Amino acid sequence: MSADSESMIESAPISFTDAAAAKVKELRDDEGNPNLKLRVYITGGGCAGFSYGFTFDETVNEDDTSVEKEGVILLVDAMSIQYLDGSVVDYEKGLMGSRFVVSNPNAATTCGCGSSFSV
């Protein structure tokens, strides 16, 4: 990797862990579609005001922020990136099950389950 690509990755407004990238690869392989990308978005709702959402998408929209890691692409729309700036997407396995989670430095409060937040 060149120094230019490393600095682009370090300055990305959102990032994701190796565990998240590995899980996306696994799910993408299960679907048999190498064009699937993980889209992270924000919606109104949840017990704290905003909720995180995750879906697979084949389309990269013009205003999307796109980050690549280990051949996996993470997409965030223009509205959501303002709330997710500096966040890290991870994949966790625990007693409550397995799920993608967001560590968001912009969240003033989060709910107990971690799926909603307020700013």
UniProtKB/Swiss-Prot annotation:
According to its UniProt entry, the function of this protein is described as: Required for insertion of 4Fe-4S clusters for at least IspG.
Source organism per UniProt: Alcanivorax borkumensis (strain ATCC 700651 / DSM 11573 / NCIMB 13689 / SK2)
Checking SUPFAM superfamilies in the record gives: HesB-like domain
Tell me the cofactors it needs: iron-sulfur cluster
Specify the superkingdom.
Answer: Bacteria
Q: Biological process GO terms, please?
A: iron-sulfur cluster assembly
Q: Which GO terms describe its molecular function?
A: 2 iron, 2 sulfur cluster binding; 4 iron, 4 sulfur cluster binding; iron ion binding
Q: What is this protein called?
A: Iron-sulfur cluster insertion protein ErpA
Gene that encodes the chain: erpA
Q: How is the cofactor bound?
A: Binds 1 iron-sulfur cluster per subunit.
